[in-house]
Amino acid sequence: RDCLLSRGLGDVYKRQIRINRFGATTAEEFKKAMKELQKQGMKDMILDLQGNGGGYLNAAIDLANEFLGQKELIVYTEGRTAKRSDFYAKGNGDFRNGRLIILVDEYTASASEIVSGAVQDWDRGIIVGRRSFGKGLVQRPIDLPDGSMIRLTIARYYTPSGRSIQKPYDSTVDYNKDLIERFNHGELM
């Protein structure tokens, strides 16, 4: 199961749904859990993406669609030779009006960052927690003649406002600077 209901928040109007990963059935599981909570009177939601390392792009798009209006950009990809591809919300989601809080941490990555980035850029909810991992690369698998495979990075993911999800590691200096900055802000304790 990719989606879990958390009990014991006290207020029936606020409930938490935790998503462990973005698999093939995540959006379907989320909708089922959300509808159950709405029957119980849920008005506001806490979506816990802490420790979620990502998964399928389509699952992230389907989940973000639950919160966003029609034709709102969820994410786009663009590379040096790969043309820009845009992914939009259909506007038929079931939780477009209630208050939304998304929990993230330093292990929240990839598809999770796509969802939280879209919600943040559209001012649809509040993101709470530590800075997320920063994994935003589009990779294409290439089969080799010996039966092995490599993944070639062809583009990056960008939030609706144009922020690259991928951390910029052009050198180890940037990596170490980011690590020190995160430590100084208490993010790695």
Predicted regions and their residues:
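Positively charged, low-complexity/disordered segments
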Residues: 2-10
